[in-house]
Amino acid sequence: MTRSARWLYGWLLLLPAAALLALFTHYPTLGTLWHSFFSTPRGERSPTFVGLENYRQLADDPIFWQALTNNLWYAAGTIPLSIALALAMAAWVNGKMAGRGLLRLAYFTPTILPMIAVANIWLFFYTPEYGLLEKLTGALGLPAHNWLGSKSTALGALMAVAVWKEAGFFMIFYLAALQQMSPHLAEAAAIEGASRWYFFRRVTFPLLMPTTLFVLVNAVINAFRLVDHIVVMTRGGPDNATALLLYYIYEIGFRFWDPMYGAALTMVLLALLGMAALAQFWFLERRVHYQ
């Protein structure tokens, strides 16, 4: 087979996936960008080109800035906690112990539960006076508290749900990476007198950097795409304390019927995710390949 024939054969193999990617990813993105420069049609009034008016409206929108701030706090809390917990769980269940399979299943179970089911389970835990959390705090003599109804604790309560659900999912990737490591590394470190913590810090964790990069990218995406739990548990309240960017976009587009403004919000979210992804690859790619 000639070089040109191999080149053509390779592109023919890529063509179905490339067509689907263009149809369901690139085309909607370009369509959203185009619509963000138009006004929303009202009644008999057709959409008109308004340029950057939607983006100027966005810059003056206090709810957008609150949702962005909430999302940044949510990401700052859930991403490191879920990754650290996943790594700790993977390191634990990777060792030899009785009931290791059941423990792995217990850790992974929250991941396979439907999002709405998880939200309802935790909604019961947080129910004032009757919820499981209230019963536990009451037994300790602590005062009753409305966890989802208080601005100071509502976002933290949602973060706990996300960490509980995502840590088991990330654990699977870390566990797979740990199982691929040669046991001779640990044996050599033990012979040299290295402590378990030193071996983890200097050998295990650097070898896990490719997995950590993959997990981190997924964790960032998950932190900016939460809608289900908010709809079921708080609906963005109290006083927009739990409104995140994607939920605010959902409300603008489907509750207030302003899809063009929602398109502008979506482009801002895509830009934020793009910058976050570039920063992750730029900083972590060097550590992954030891540059």
Task: Label the model's feature ranges.
Residues 1-5:
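Short, Lys/Arg-rich, polar N-terminal cytosolic tail immediately upstream
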Residues 6-291:
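A structural signal for multi-pass alpha-helical bundles of membrane permease subunits
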